[in-house]
Amino acid sequence: MLTLLLIIPLVGALMLAPMQGNTRQSESQMKRLALGTSLINFVLSIVLWGEFDSSTSEYQFTQEFNQVNFCHLHIGVDGISLYFVLLTTFITPICILSNWDNIKEQLKYFLMCFLVLETLLIAVFVVLDILLFYVFFESVLIPLFLIVGIWGGSATRVRAAFLLFLYTLFGSLFMLLAFLVIYYNVGSTDFQVVSLSEINLESQKLLWLAVFISMAIKTPLLPFHVWLPRAHAEAPLAGSVILAGLILKLATYGYMRILIQFLPDATSYFSPLVQTIAVITLIYASLATLRQTDFKALVAYSSIGHMAVVVLGLFSNTIQGIDGALLLSIAHGVVSPALFILVGGVLYDRYHTRTIRYYRGMTAYMPLFSIMFFVFTIFNAAVPLSANWAGEFLCLAGAFQRNPVFAVLGSTGIVLSAAYSIWLYNRIAFGAWSKYLNYTTDLTRREFMLLLPLLFVAVVFGIFPNIILDSIHASTSGLIYSAS
């Protein structure tokens, strides 16, 4: 079944390759083919979820195809990777729908990039080999670079694409060196073999630092955060959705799968340092969010703050913290794309400006938009009965067990998150109608149907977070106990 999840998007991309998009009918056929392919993959992932046994921490649905001297194609999922696979197949059709009407140039290649990107992301989460993990982890940059550089929103899009590409590629060179050293010492790149091997603490420290630099850039943590706001500001809407919904989650997965599982002693040693960086990043990003004038940059900085809370929970080295980090990652992967669709899609498509000061009084003329914007804004602020709140609470509870100071400082992020969320909604929704804006229509049917599944998932996982927590508990517990 995992093989099908990897192959189906590639088949869809190959079917798109010979098609010509010279007419409106042919463009519609290409979009329907890409959307249908991604929906088939989503249904298949739901079947995978239904057949998954959450009572064990072992890898399931494993398949092994060939073996060579240095790596082999071995795939499988556990409770940790399963939800990242589900998130990938859920977000991809939303990406395709989000730019359904406003990509006119090279549409075929735009759709092919997203289908190839879906395969690469799923591969990152299911491969059980550190070298293949690195290959797919870095291969994601190629379609992402094309998406931002070709279909971005302004003349500086190429610069933003290069910034994204070079920043993340530079950090990953250290990770490659670390993986080669692990292979040299252990004699294998298989996850299970590496996790059972014993590496002395001094070697672990060097390997840990090399991998951490790569993950810190992808998260991103201070001071490696510069690329993300620029990439979000220049990316097309679908690019922003996949950046917030999926690309940032690669770091979350890498922290759990590589650092905590394979280098546990070094993780314990460096945890206070990482939590300090996470708290500084959280406070800095939240304060920077209050100063933004571009609403895509504002949502981007809020994402940095939320990912800092994820890191704070992960490096508490507690079951509660890691459970909360995974739950918050999934919640952020749903809520943040919805905010980008609302401000970077609905508003920008109508008025073609991202400057917040031009917007005011939207409640009177776009009531449905205002309701949706209010719901996702308060979810982003982690109000009770939202999945963000459950995730942040568990992250802070885990941090409190290790060091109450980090938990108290991290809690300031909740206050600042509420501050910028309330300010943004009040600025856009209320007040007299702006003289800079023409009257326009409310949410279209496509926009509403695009937001509805995101709203459904955010509400269900907010009211019933145990749907996720119960099924990941065995895997996260196994992660902690095997590390200890």
UniProtKB/Swiss-Prot annotation:
InterPro entries: NADH_Q_OxRdtase_chainM/4, NADH_UbQ_OxRdtase, ND/Mrp_TM. Pfam families: Proton_antipo_M (PF00361). NCBIfam families: NDH_I_M. This is NADH-ubiquinone oxidoreductase chain 4. It is a multi-pass membrane protein. It is found in: Mitochondrion inner membrane. PANTHER family: NADH-UBIQUINONE OXIDOREDUCTASE CHAIN 4. GO terms for cellular component: mitochondrial inner membrane; respiratory chain complex I. It comes from the Eukaryota. It comes from Mycosarcoma maydis (Corn smut fungus). GO terms for biological process: aerobic respiration; ATP synthesis coupled electron transport; electron transport coupled proton transport. The gene is ND4. Its main location: mitochondrion. GO terms for molecular function: NADH dehydrogenase (ubiquinone) activity; ubiquinone binding. Keywords: Electron transport, Membrane, Mitochondrion, Mitochondrion inner membrane, NAD, Respiratory chain, Translocase, Transmembrane, Transmembrane helix, Transport, Ubiquinone. It catalyses: a ubiquinone + NADH + 5 H(+)(in) = a ubiquinol + NAD(+) + 4 H(+)(out). Core subunit of the mitochondrial membrane respiratory chain NADH dehydrogenase (Complex I) that is believed to belong to the minimal assembly required for catalysis. Complex I functions in the transfer of electrons from NADH to the respiratory chain. The immediate electron acceptor for the enzyme is believed to be ubiquinone. The keyword Metal-binding does not apply. Belongs to the complex I subunit 4 family. Coiled coil: none annotated. The chain crosses the membrane at residues 1-21, 33-53, 77-97, 109-129, 130-150, 162-182, 206-226, 236-256, 270-290, 295-315, 326-346, 365-385, 405-425, 448-468. Its EC number is 7.1.1.2.
